[in-house]
From Swiss-Prot:
Belongs to the NadD family. InterPro entries: Cyt_trans-like, NadD/NMNAT, Rossmann-like_a/b/a_fold. GO terms for molecular function: ATP binding; nicotinate-nucleotide adenylyltransferase activity. Its EC number is 2.7.7.18. This is Nicotinate-nucleotide adenylyltransferase. GO terms for biological process: NAD biosynthetic process. It catalyses: nicotinate beta-D-ribonucleotide + ATP + H(+) = deamido-NAD(+) + diphosphate. Catalyzes the reversible adenylation of nicotinate mononucleotide (NaMN) to nicotinic acid adenine dinucleotide (NaAD). The keyword Ion transport does not apply.
Length: 213
């Protein structure tokens, strides 16, 4: 049996501890040995990132250099059109074959918006969803049919993620750090310290490049 792999996508503008630490805790909780961290090139739901694709990629390489859990995925950086998660996960499934257990990691805020995503209802055909819980967000979807969808696929057993190739939603009790890329960009613009918010080598690179000023 192939071991469970997970994909963790985002803009990472810049990458910070709020991205990395909850996923590291998640990996320990559910026995996950490989996470592909995949930056968007052209995010469909957000404005263009301030840092270039090459700069965001390099910051990720610095951040995960001493973390064997993480592998950098460049699939979406190689695409100049908007990166839709459903398309990315479908292509990943085709590469890995029908039996490999695959998961996509999102935050609880993203789960609540999930029905607005492009082809959201196909995503569980190709992967599991692992949701990092966040305090202050409701546990229920806003519409009854979406709540029914959540309950239909919900599992409380991490073993299901390893034993089945796709189709389950798991709510993980991970630590929530009050850190956001927006906060970091604002503090850097004001010249305030960000030493405790992101890896030192990433911060050094940001300063060398004059990013977010």
């Amino acid at each position: 049996m192939k071991s469970l792999q997970a994909l963790f996508g985002g803009t990472f503008d810049p990458v910070h501890y709020g991205h990395l630490k909850p996923v590291e805790t998640l990996a320990n909780l559910i026995g996950l040995s490989r996470v592909i961290i995949m930056p968007n090139n052209v995010p469909p739901h957000r404005p263009q990132p301030e840092a270039s694709s090459a700069q965001r990629k390099y910051m990720l390489e610095l951040a995960i250099a001493d973390k064997p859990l993480f592998t950098l995925g460049e699939r979406e950086l190689q695409r100049n059109a908007p990166s839709y998660t459903a398309q990315t996960l479908k292509a990943w499934r085709e590469e890995q074959g029908p039996e490999a257990p695959l998961a996509f990691i999102i935050g609880q805020d993203s789960l609540l918006n999930f029905p607005t995503w492009h082809d959201y209802d196909t995503i569980l055909d190709n992967t599991h969803l692992i949701v990092c819980r966040r305090p202050g967000y409701p546990l229920e979807m806003t519409q009854a049919q979406h709540q029914q969808w959540l309950e239909q696929h919900l599992t409380h057993t991490p073993d299901d993620l390893h034993q089945l190739p796709a189709g389950k939603i798991y709510l993980a009790e991970t630590p929530w750090l009050n850190i956001s890329a927006t906060l970091i960009r604002e503090r850097l613009e004001k010249g305030e310290s960000c030493d405790d918010l992101l890896p030192e080598n990433v911060l050094n690179y940001i300063n060398q490049q004059g990013l977010y000023r």
